[in-house]
Amino acid sequence: MALEAGDMEEGQLSDSDSDMTVVPSDRPLQMAKVLGGGGAACAPVSNYRTVKHVDSSEESLDSDDDCSLWKRKRQKCHSPPPKPEPFPFGQSGQKPALNGGKKVNNIWGAVLQEQNQDAVATELGILGMEGTIDRSRQSETYNYLLAKKLAKKESQEYTKELDKDLDEYMHGDKKPGSKEEENGQGHLKRKRPVRDRLGNRVEMNYKGRYDITEEDSPEKVADEIAFRLQEPKKDLIARVVTILGNKKAIELLMETAEVEQNGGLFIMNGSRRRTPGGVFLNLLKNTPSISEEQIKDIFYIENQKEYENKKAARKRRTQLLGKKMKEAIKSLNFQEDDDTSRETFASDTNEALASLDEAQEGPGETKLDAEDAIEVDHPQDLDIF
C-alpha cells in the first residue's frame, strides 16, 4: 500500500475506491485559523475535498503540501480580487427605498387629487354625464364636460325667456324685455347677432307659382306677390294692391326682383340688408308717382299699432315712477312745522297718482295725431322695436 502510494505522482489519486476512506481533514481547519481572513474563504471547500488516509508520516506531509497548494490555486481561480466600491453597501441599499418612497407619494397624491375632483363633481350634480375627463394635466385639468352642460343649460334658459317675452308681446301688447327694464337688468344681457335675432336671410322667389296680370283679381295678385317676396304680412300687401292697383303693384314687384338680383338694399344704419318685402315697401315710399296720402292709408294700421305700443310703454314708465314716489313718501317722516316740504311732495304725489289712475282705467284714446304719425321703413321694423 505504501509502495503504491510512492509510485503515484503528486496530486494523483488511486483508481480503487475500496482502499479509500472518506474522512474530513483536520489540518485544513487549523490552517484556516492560522491564515485568518484569507483562509476563511476556503474553509467550506475543505469539507468537500477528500484525501486518502495513510499511515506514513512522509505521505501525510506530502498530502498536506498538496492540499495547501490546491487551496492556493483554488483561491486564485474562484476568488476574484475585491473591487473598490464607490459607495458603502448600506447607502446603496437605502437608495431604492427613497426612490420607492417618492413613487408611492406620487401615486397617493394622484389618488387624492382624483378623489377631490370626484367630490367636487358630486356636489355639482354631474354624476350622470357621459365620458371621462383627461387628468393628465393634474391641477390644470379643465372639466369641459361640465362647461358644455352649463353652456347648454344657459342657452335653454335664455331661449325660454325669449319665447316667453315673444308670447307676452304677441298676446298682451307688451314689448320684449319689459320685465328686465322694470327690474333694471335690461343692460346685463349681451345683444344677440343678427342671424340669431332675425334668422336666416329670406331669399326672394323669382319664378313664383304662376304668372299674374292686370286682369287678375286683387286677391290673387296680392297672394302671389306675398309668396314671391316671402312676406308674412299678407294683409299689408293686400292693402298695397287695393290702394295702388294691380298694375302698379306688379311694377313694384319687378323692380324689387331687379334690385334683389343686383345685391339688395341696406337699411338706414347699414348694419344689414333689407328683406325682399322691405325692398318692396322702400321702393313704394320712394316712388314719385305714389302720393303721401296713399302711403299713409297703406301704413295706417301699422302706424296706429306702433303708436299704441309707445303710449302703453309711456304709461308703464309713469306708473312705475308713481309707485316709487309713493314708497319714498311713506318712508319719510315730516315734522309738523315743515309745511313747505309737505306741499311740494303733495303736488308731485298727486301727479303721480293721477297717472296711476289713468293707467288703471285701460287703453286710452286710439286716435292717431298727425304729429305722432310714423312712417315704417319695412314691416319687420315693427317687430324689432
From Swiss-Prot:
Q: Which residues carry this modification: N-acetylalanine?
A: A2
**Acidic residues composition bias: residue spans:** 1-18
Question: What keywords does the record list, in alphabetical order?
Answer: Acetylation, Cytoplasm, Nucleus, Phosphoprotein, Protein transport, RNA-binding, Transport
Biological process (GO) annotations?
Answer: protein transport; RNA stabilization; snRNA export from nucleus
State whether it acts alone or in a complex, and with which partners, per the record. Answer: Found in a U snRNA export complex with PHAX/RNUXA, NCBP1/CBP80, NCBP2/CBP20, RAN, XPO1 and m7G-capped RNA. Part of a precomplex with PHAX/RNUXA, NCBP1/CBP80, NCBP2/CBP20 and m7G-capped RNA. Interacts with NCBP1/CBP80. Found in a complex with snoRNA. Interacts with NCBP2/CBP20. Interacts with DDX39A; this interaction stimulates PHAX RNA binding activity.
Q: Which species is the source of this protein?
A: Rattus norvegicus (Rat)
PTMs per UniProt: Phosphorylated in the nucleus. Dephosphorylated in the cytoplasm.
* Necessary for interaction with CBP80: annotated span: 2-320
Residue ranges of the region described as Necessary for poly U RNA-binding and snRNA export: 270-278
Role, per record: A phosphoprotein adapter involved in the XPO1-mediated U snRNA export from the nucleus. Bridge components required for U snRNA export, the cap binding complex (CBC)-bound snRNA on the one hand and the GTPase Ran in its active GTP-bound form together with the export receptor XPO1 on the other. Its phosphorylation in the nucleus is required for U snRNA export complex assembly and export, while its dephosphorylation in the cytoplasm causes export complex disassembly. It is recycled back to the nucleus via the importin alpha/beta heterodimeric import receptor.
Q: Please give the residue positions where the record annotates the modification Phosphothreonine.
A: T287
Q: What is its main location?
A: nucleus
Q: In chain numbering, where does the motif Nuclear export signal fall?
A: 120-129
Per the record, the similarity remark reads: Belongs to the PHAX family.
Q: What name does UniProt use for this protein?
A: Phosphorylated adapter RNA export protein
Where in this protein does the record put region Disordered? 1-26, 72-101, 164-192, 334-385
Q: In which tissues is it expressed?
A: Expressed in dorsal root ganglia and sensory neuron cell bodies.
